[in-house]
UniProtKB/Swiss-Prot annotation:
Cleaves the N-terminal amino acid of tripeptides. It holds the Pfam family Peptidase_M20. GO terms for molecular function: metallopeptidase activity; tripeptide aminopeptidase activity; zinc ion binding. Its main location: cytoplasm. This is Peptidase T. Its EC number is 3.4.11.4. GO terms for cellular component: cytosol.
Length: 406
């Protein structure tokens, strides 16, 4: 089904810079997310007929309710999307609307080309309306497509009171892209039987498995001596960082893994001879493999310290989130409902693990099973991001179908 305001709504949202800040200790981490919630989304939610619309300063979530129109439908269902965008330029986003007929797409005057040679997924969108960047920013379909889809579905239901649906809660939250958005999620306030994050990618994605995730921060303490007289005296902290990295399995990196394979990812390295720091993320699906990965990192550091006869490798290892499969597989109702709706709409469900995490990973372990639905974005987190309007429309269709199921 086509929805009159869906594209307009999406374009309005993405033009607002809501990039999160990993270095901030505030909640949300940027004022722009607060402003987006209070000056754009909250008035719109109230205007379309949502009730009890309220912003929670304690966690940065904007929440509203669409009351049920049927006593027959017993479930209370939530839909959640995040307001922030990823760590890429989000200032002066200028979307392009392209009626795609194949071939390359010039991204404004940036000199960048969105080409099916580099991104074969473009070949899935011949004849569709694509929204792209101008090559200078990301787009923000992750996850403003999800927000636009949820809002459009709620507006449709509010304007069609004859449609039977269950009680619906809507939540728009902050800071998902930096992994802390759901840390303070208020389960009691949201009060649903189960929920969905609308934060997935291509048409049909339906996901209830995520990585289990840990962060690893290492500090290497060296001893700087003039290199001309350094023999048996200098300890080069940068070399220690390299030595640590070389002991990790070289084929277990993001660029060499897929499907259910885990990895170690070195994403930051800095320092001098005197001190160096490296930061990793550790990811795996099965609990036993996740524990083994963390233990290997600790063992390497311990062995290096033993060889150096002092604690020159300092380890900070902490869990970030866990595979929500452990929660959701206890009751597959939200998966079964979404799958049934997709099949009724002639959408093929793509049930695959997320090689990442969602807010649903944490929310599921807080007590609300929260799998992930497609929102349409492709090539997310950069200048080559795009989304199909037709896929967004189908996401709205799926939301409408879910809330009408018993």
């Amino acid at each position: 089904m086509s929805y009159e305001k869906l594209l307009e709504r999406f374009l309005t949202y993405v033009k607002i810079n809501t990039r999160s800040n990993p270095n901030s200790t505030q909640t949300p981490t940027t004022q722009s997310q607060v402003d987006f919630a209070l000056t754009v989304l909250k008035p719109e939610m109230e205007a379309i007929g949502l009730k009890d619309v309220h912003y929670l300063p304690s966690n940065g979530y904007l929440v509203g309710t669409l009351p049920a129109t049927s006593d027959r439908l017993r479930h209370k269902i939530g839909f959640i999307s995040h307001m922030d965008t990823a760590d890429f330029n989000a200032e002066n986003i200028t979307p392009q609307i392209v009626d795609y007929k194949g071939g390359d797409i010039e991204l404004g005057d940036s000199g960048y080309i969105l080409s099916p040679k580099d991104f074969p997924n473009l070949n899935n969108y011949h004849g569709q309306t694509l929204i792209t960047t101008d090559g200078k920013t990301l787009l923000g379909a992750d996850d403003k497509s999800g927000i636009a889809e949820i809002m459009t579905a709620m507006e449709y239901l509010a304007s069609h009171p004859e449609i039977e649906h269950c009680e619906i809660r809507v939540g728009f939250g902050p800071d998902e892209e930096i992994g802390i958005g759901a840390d303070k999620f208020d389960v009691k306030d949201f009060d649903v039987d189960f929920a969905y994050t609308v934060d997935g990618g291509p048409l049909g994605e339906l996901q209830y498995e995520t990585f289990s995730a840990a962060g690893l921060e290492l500090t290497f303490e060296g001893r700087n001596v003039h290199p001309g007289t350094a023999k048996n005296q200098m300890i080069n902290a940068l070399q220690l960082a390299m030595d640590f990295h070389s002991q990790l399995p070289e084929n277990e990196r993001p660029e060499q893994t897929d499907d259910y394979q885990g990895f170690y990812h070195l994403y930051d390295l800095s320092g001098t001879v005197d001190q160096a720091k490296s930061s990793y993320i550790i990811r795996d699906f099965e609990e036993v493999d996740f524990l083994k990965r963390k233990q290997l990192a600790q063992d390497i550091a311990d062995n290096m310290n033993e060889a150096l006869q002092s604690e020159r490798v300092k380890v900070k290892l902490y869990d970030q989130y866990y595979n929500m499969k452990k929660v959701i597989e206890k009751d597959m109702t939200p998966i079964n409902i979404a799958k049934e709706v997709m099949e009724e709409l002639d959408i093929k469900p793509i049930i695959e693990p997320i090689r990442g995490g969602t807010d649903g990973s944490k929310i599921s372990f807080m007590g609300i099973p929260t799998p992930n639905l497609f929102a349409g974005g492709e090539n997310m987190h950069g200048r080559f991001e795009f989304v199909s309007l037709q896929t967004m429309e189908k996401a709205v269709d799926v939301i409408l179908g879910i809330v009408a199921k018993d």
